[in-house]
């Protein structure tokens, strides 16, 4: 059974390496930060991803990841160490011996700082293939190098030195480098090491304060709602009390009319009794009594109608009052809803 070979990505081109070094220079405060916490680690990982995006934007056809560009930088730094060592060995062999301590210092100087390389006057760039020498066996993301003509203008030494000088950090340009573009997403990076450690609990305290403030507002709204509900129940209670009073008043009026009716009936019965002794006098009196009774009946009916009219007017007034209260409760309900939506936003 044939073993399938995994297709490996091509080597980094000159343009990709140049872009990689430039982007590392822009983000050196983040990538080479000595602080160790979760926030800094996330920021470093995002910085490498952004560098990979910038390298991919060159358009060489390969899609690099943050891990690949980081590994490419480590290879590049190892290459710089080897070339610096060779250059120092040449100096020693040409009659300029260096003490062992000075040799070690020269090998490590500036390598582990910021970017890890600098534009050294005693270092001679022989070929632009140095951009690709860091590939080889040190990385897993590269394949055989592309064949290029070293005599082409693209690989002129002067142009290469100019490109290198554009990506090598310089003390005069360090203050002009742009800040890490997404640093605001993970708080402001300060030169004081204890600043980020202070910001995290401070941010948590602010979040807790905001949560408590929102909870307090919610409780205030709930208290207002309960107060409105209490007022509504009080109004409903008053309305029922008025209805009970009206019912009792009507019941008393009904009993009074019943008594008046009994009284009139007794008067009629008494007026109809014949009197043999006073037939003439009683005849005249009996003619007047039916008229008086009819007048009383009309008067009582008029009073009853007036009472009924007053009752209807009172009920109308109660109806209008309840309608006004209903509208007030609706307005209060809308106000609480708008206030609640404002807090949620």
Curated annotation (Swiss-Prot):
**Numbered residues of crosslink Glycyl lysine isopeptide (Lys-Gly) (interchain with G-Cter in SUMO2):** 9, 114, 142, 237, 254, 273
Any one Gene Ontology cellular component term annotated for this protein: nucleus
Q: Which residues does the UniProt record annotate as the domain Myb-like?
A: 4-77
Coiled coil listed as a keyword: yes
**Chain spans, region Disordered:** 143-175
Phosphothreonine occurs at 188
Keyword Repeat part of the UniProt annotation: no
The coiled-coil segments of this chain are 203-345
Segments passing through the bilayer = none
What are the protein's UniProt keywords?
Coiled coil, Isopeptide bond, Phosphoprotein, Ubl conjugation
Which positions does the record annotate as the modified residue Phosphoserine?
A: 106
Task: Output the PANTHER family linked to this UniProt entry.
Answer: MYB/SANT-LIKE DNA-BINDING DOMAIN-CONTAINING PROTEIN 4, MYB_SANT-LIKE DNA-BINDING DOMAIN-CONTAINING PROTEIN 4
Name of the protein: Myb/SANT-like DNA-binding domain-containing protein 4
């Amino acid at each position: 059974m044939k073993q399938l070979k995994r297709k490996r990505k091509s080597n980094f081109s000159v343009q990709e390496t140049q872009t990689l070094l430039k982007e590392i220079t822009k983000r050196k405060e983040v990538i080479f930060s000595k602080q160790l916490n979760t926030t800094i680690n996330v920021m470093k990982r995002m910085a490498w991803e952004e560098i990979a995006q910038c390298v991919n934007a060159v358009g060489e056809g390969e899609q690099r990841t943050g891990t690949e560009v980081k590994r490419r930088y480590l290879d590049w730094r190892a290459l710089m160490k080897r070339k610096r060592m060779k250059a120092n060995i040449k100096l020693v062999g040409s009659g300029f011996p260096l003490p062992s301590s000075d040799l070690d210092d020269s090998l490590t100087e500036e390598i582990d700082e910021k970017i890890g390389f600098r534009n050294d006057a005693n270092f001679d760039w022989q070929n632009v293939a140095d951009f690709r020498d860091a590939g080889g066996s040190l990385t897993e993301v590269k394949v055989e190098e592309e064949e290029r003509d070293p005599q082409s203008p693209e690989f002129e030494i002067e142009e290469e030195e100019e490109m290198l000088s554009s990506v090598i950090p310089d003390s005069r340009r360090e203050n002009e480098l742009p800040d890490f573009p997404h640093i605001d997403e993970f708080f402001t990076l300060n030169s004081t090491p204890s600043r980020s450690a202070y910001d995290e609990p401070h941010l948590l305290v602010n979040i807790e304060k905001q949560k408590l403030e929102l909870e307090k507002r919610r409780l205030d709204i709930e208290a207002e709602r309960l107060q409105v509900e209490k007022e509504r129940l009080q109004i409903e209670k008053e309305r029922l009390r008025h209805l009970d009073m009206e019912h009792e008043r009507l019941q008393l009026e009904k009993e009074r009319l019943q008594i008046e009716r009994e009284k009139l009936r007794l008067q009629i019965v008494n007026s109809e009794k014949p009197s043999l002794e006073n037939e003439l006098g009683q005849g005249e009196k009996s003619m007047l009594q039916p008229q008086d009774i009819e007048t009383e009946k009309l008067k009582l009916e008029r009073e009853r109608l007036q009472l009924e009219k007053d009752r209807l007017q009172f009920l109308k007034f109660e109806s209008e009052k309840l309608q006004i209260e209903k509208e007030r409760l609706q307005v209060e309900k809308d106000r609480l809803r708008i206030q609640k939506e404002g807090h949620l936003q």
